[in-house]
Amino acid sequence: MKITVEDGSQISKNAVKELEKHADMIECQCPNKLIEILHKVREFTDYTEDCIEKYPEDRDTHKWLKSSAINLDQLLSTTIIQLARFEGFIDENNEFVDRGEGS
């Protein structure tokens, strides 16, 4: 499986799930912690979208918050991909490495 990004710079949900499976390849929990933060940012992005509809008087504020959350998502996505490459989860072509399971 290849890591893919959506909207140009956000890691896809399927790639996040696959990375979660590979995160046990190293002892430290940094990959898992970053993925947890990414999930929270995505929840917040969805929440701000709801606020845009629910609170039209604060529409501009919530649009700004949503835009900021998307920027955080993009930063976290690129950080997670680079960390996965550093730790050997993925290769230079963003393909997941074979863990050698079942051999």
Regions found by a protein language model. Give the residues of each.
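Short, charged/polar, low-complexity loop and linker segments
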Residues: 10-26, 50-60
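Terminal, compositionally biased segments
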Residues: 1-22, 88-103
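Amphipathic, heptad-repeat alpha-helices with coiled-coil/zipper character that mediate oligomerization
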Residues: 29-50
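Generic alpha-helix signal with a bias toward terminal, lower-confidence helices
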Residues: 38, 50, 60, 77, ...
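Amphipathic alpha-helical binding modules
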Residues: 66-103
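Amphipathic alpha-helical coiled-coil oligomerization segments
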Residues: 48-51, 55-58, 62-69, 90
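Short, solvent-exposed segments of well-ordered alpha helices
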Residues: 6, 24-35, 59-63, 67
